[in-house]
Design a protein with these regions (language model features):
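Conserved pre-motif I regulatory segment
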Residues: 1-31
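Hydrophobic residues on the short alpha-helix immediately C-terminal to a glycine-rich phosphate/catalytic loop
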Residues: 22, 41-49, 71, 153
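Pre-Walker A (Motif I) flank of P-loop NTPase domains
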Residues: 24-30, 55-57, 114-115
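Walker A/P-loop
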Residues: 25-45
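Conserved Walker A/P-loop ATP-binding site and its immediately adjacent core
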Residues: 39-44, 54-77
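Conserved helix-turn-beta segment of the N-terminal RecA-like "Helicase ATP-binding" lobe
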Residues: 66-100
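Conserved two-lobed SF2 helicase motor
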Residues: 109-127
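SF2 helicase catalytic motif II
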Residues: 121-124, 129-166
Length: 169
């Protein structure tokens, strides 16, 4: 995996503390004020995970399509040489689907690649139905994760993903 040195941000103490906790706990809440660098915590953690000799699949969940696309752009400023999928109904130049079978197929043709999947809370159940093995999942604006329609998929990934983190302000 190539990790871009461009736009490398010096992490602040609270971000380093969050990353240290993420290294030792498989499940947790990361509470950082708006503008405090939650996205950079996710990106830095993903970079660490992608250094593993075994390929990893990381899912990033956002409340809106626009934010999912924005997070994708931010991640890809710092992480390259990964397979990227979007699971939502919005437009993107990456592979995109809302069909669980298509996502399963995409996953199967990228067995040796690190993978980033960007989705919304509305479409998270599509990833659950695809049976893609998720190593790490980041829930952005995590207060959305407990809404009645979203909770079953949230609960599934909090129990079944190797690592699960809820980011909120």
């Amino acid at each position: 995996m190539n990790i871009s040195n461009e736009n490398t941000m010096q992490l602040r103490p609270h971000q380093l503390e969050a990353l240290d906790k993420m290294n030792t706990k498989r499940l947790g809440q990361i509470i950082v004020p708006t503008g405090g660098g939650k996205t950079m915590c996710m990106i830095e953690d993903a970079k660490r995970q992608f250094k593993s000799p075994v390929s990893k699949t990381i899912v990033v969940v956002a409340p809106r399509i626009l934010l999912a696309n924005q997070l994708s752009s931010e991640f890809l400023e710092h992480i390259t040489n990964v397979a990227v999928a979007h699971v939502h109904s919005g437009e993107t130049h990456h592979f995109s689907t809302t069909n669980s079978i298509d996502l399963t197929h995409w996953d199967s043709i990228n067995p040796h690649h690190n993978k980033l999947i960007f989705t919304t809370y509305h479409s998270l159940h599509k990833i659950q139905n695809s049976m893609v093995d998720v190593d790490t999942i980041y829930f952005d604006e995590a207060h959305n994760s407990v809404q009645k329609n979203f909770y079953p998929a949230t609960e599934h990934f909090s129990r079944n993903a190797d690592r699960c983190y809820f980011f909120t302000a």
